Amino acid sequence: MRKRQLLACAMPALLAGCGSLPPFYESHAGTQVASLRVLTLMQGSTFVTTAARLDCKKDPDGKRLGMFSPWLAGDWTGERAGLDHKLSLPGGEGLPHNMFSEWAIDADVPFIVHASAVIRGGGSGFVTGTTYVANNVEINNVAGFTPKAGHVYEIVYGIGPAKPELRLFEVQREEGGQVTRQSVPFDLGNQGC
């Protein structure tokens, strides 16, 4: 039940009513922040994505600050999660994604992103439209970046032509409401803290 509650709070339609941001971000209101959206294009797989500040500061309870886990382990599909949002990416027209969440994160602070997946079967690739088929193969992707204040970022974790890929986009809203996504590199590589 707890997992389902958390998942519901990650849905855009319910985001405002969930008190959605972790206490860490609520307690840092007024600091320079960026917006981070996390999406997945994987279907029928078990996956978990987490992100954390690289400086690894701890709060008075000894917990790591700035840690969040948008995804929950489980065999969720877009339909089961109650979402029908479609995301258009270069090389992937209108592919549905499983889940979506949006977070306020401290700007100018390095973040590390860790995405882990256990593929249970197959799924459509979002880069070339190919299909990746495996059976209980665990794949980990780790990358980092430093968000800029006021910018909106999207992390997309999906199945590429050969394996799950972790990609970072900067989102810009132009006049007239049109939204564009520009691919940007992870600039910190495979680092931990």
PLM region spans:
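Sec-dependent bacterial lipoprotein signal peptides
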Residues: 1-20
